[in-house]
Amino acid sequence: MAAAGWRDGSGQEKYRLVVVGGGGVGKSALTIQFIQSYFVTDYDPTIEDSYTKQCVIDDRAARLDILDTAGQEEFGAMREQYMRTGEGFLLVFSVTDRGSFEEIYKFQRQILRVKDRDEFPMILIGNKADLDHQRQVTQEEGQQLARQLKVTYMEASAKIRMNVDQAFHELVRVIRKFQEQECPPSPEPTRKEKDKKGCHCVIF
């Protein structure tokens, strides 16, 4: 079977996802909407929350451990600690906040530095897409940034549950593809090798 996130005792695939982005972009709202199908209206700055959800993605059962991180700068060191264990990252900005869009570069570079990699599983999410009248970042700008970062771009809305499940599921697909490239499955033995293994000589 193809490589996957590490498996628990039941053989189920398990993935560690980390949600990162600036303060107030809706990271917690996206996460809670995905986990509990509930929209959080009050903004309460997160220090760190973790959630677990069982899913079936492309006919493969998976357990997702999701870490919702602090956007505030004073929690930067704590965020790096979580980045070390993450297997995939949702880079979240608000389409109504130009500053949060410009911060994405910082988060992406921080992840790659912590991982000591040139690339790593991430997707870019433009949240609050329902607030089109307050938009400060166009869809084209989001797509352009995603091309520069070599990641998938989606616009989402935690409020109206737009592309919420799709965002988390797509990140799992990106992780699976990355892990399969890193650790490709062992090739099937050839007929000749099978015959060789099946041949036993008995000497009298």
From Swiss-Prot:
Lipid attachment residues per UniProt (N6-palmitoyl lysine): 192, 194, 196-197
Record's subcellular location: Cell membrane; Golgi apparatus membrane
Motif Effector region per record, residues: 43-51
InterPro entries, per the entry: P-loop_NTPase (IPR027417), Small_GTP-bd (IPR005225), Small_GTPase (IPR001806), Small_GTPase_Ras-type (IPR020849)
One Pfam family cited in the UniProt record for this chain: Ras
Annotated consequence of substituting residue 199 to S: Does not affect lysine fatty-acylation
GO BP, one annotated term: Schwann cell migration
Source organism, top-level taxon: Eukaryota
Modification type Cysteine methyl ester: residues: 201
Cleaved propeptide residues: 202-204
Keywords assigned: Acetylation, Cell membrane, Disease variant, Golgi apparatus, GTP-binding, Hydrolase, Lipoprotein, Membrane, Methylation, Nucleotide-binding, Palmitate, Phosphoprotein, Prenylation, Proto-oncogene
Modified residues (N-acetylalanine): 2
The record's account of how the chain is modified after translation: May be post-translationally modified by both palmitoylation and polyisoprenylation.
Gene3D superfamilies: P-loop containing nucleotide triphosphate hydrolases
Similarity section: Belongs to the small GTPase superfamily. Ras family.
Subunit text: Interacts with RASSF5.
Known role: GTP-binding protein with GTPase activity, involved in the regulation of MAPK signaling pathway and thereby controlling multiple cellular processes. Regulates craniofacial development.
Protein name as it appears in the record: Ras-related protein R-Ras2
Organism (species): Homo sapiens
